[in-house]
């Protein structure tokens, strides 16, 4: 059974976990803020299943996962760098759907070129909106133009947050 590792299991990570469980993967996660996550799958006929997941260590997620997906807030340092790539399973894949600058892209290229990492999918990258040419042209890296927040729900939350910030500044309410 393939193992699907999540780094970050908040609201978005839990939605991604549903996909992994739904396709029959063994889902593990590491989250600095959540020790457990309850993943509920609702089916078209009204049935539902619930899965309780316990947080694993960061190193376990790296070393045991066939696929790693990242869903964490912005950071001022790399979360995936030389040492983390060394710990990852041979031939694994990595997806960054959180923030640019989370993965050291030079190390990512080295690890893809060596075969240690088989593929990457990146929605956010360093130097947005222009990825490095090595990232852009690598046949084992799929890029999307930071569209992860392009859902209706995300746009609604952004609108409310902006309105709250404007209100705080202008003191209307």
Region locations from a protein language model:
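Gly/Ala-rich phosphate-binding loop of Rossmann-like dinucleotide-binding domains
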Residues: 17, 21, 112-113
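Conserved acidic E/D residue at the C-terminus of a beta-strand in Rossmann-like folds
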Residues: 31
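Residues at the starts of beta-strands that form the adenosine-phosphate
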Residues: 3, 22-26
